[in-house]
Regions:
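Secondary-structure boundary motif
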Residues: 16-19, 34, 72
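Active-site micro-motifs of SAM-dependent methyltransferase domains
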Residues: 12, 31, 85-88
Length: 109
């Protein structure tokens, strides 16, 4: 089993979800604990560099969980950076902003 860590912004994303979406997210996070490669590797999405991040579809593909693997060579921690709607690239724009704020040009992939 791998450890799941949510950055503070992702905790807020989670708290803002309604009950049925939270249930779907919880199930997917439980699956992720045993398989860090469950998601699809992201690259450049809508001119946002998300290299090194993965996405998982949740709740009928209406929502995404975006995460990365800390130390991909020896995975112990899966770090969730956001949970949100895909519509109008909302979640990807949030993650792009968070990357700039937290990592700047020092993004670890």
């Amino acid at each position: 089993m791998y450890k799941i860590l949510l950055i503070p912004e992702a905790v807020k994303d989670y708290k803002d979800l309604d009950g049925s979406v939270k249930i779907s997210v919880n199930k997917k996070i439980d699956e992720l604990k045993s398989n860090p490669f469950l998601g699809e590797l992201l690259g450049n999405k809508f001119n946002i560099d998300l290299s090194g991040f993965y996405k998982i579809y949740v709740h009928g593909k209406k929502f995404r969980i975006v995460y990365r693997l800390l130390n991909p060579e020896n995975i112990e921690i899966i770090e969730i950076w956001g949970i949100g709607k895909r519509e109008k690239e909302e979640i990807y724009r949030k993650i792009g902003k968070r990357i700039k704020e937290k990592l700047g040009n020092n993004k670890i992939t």
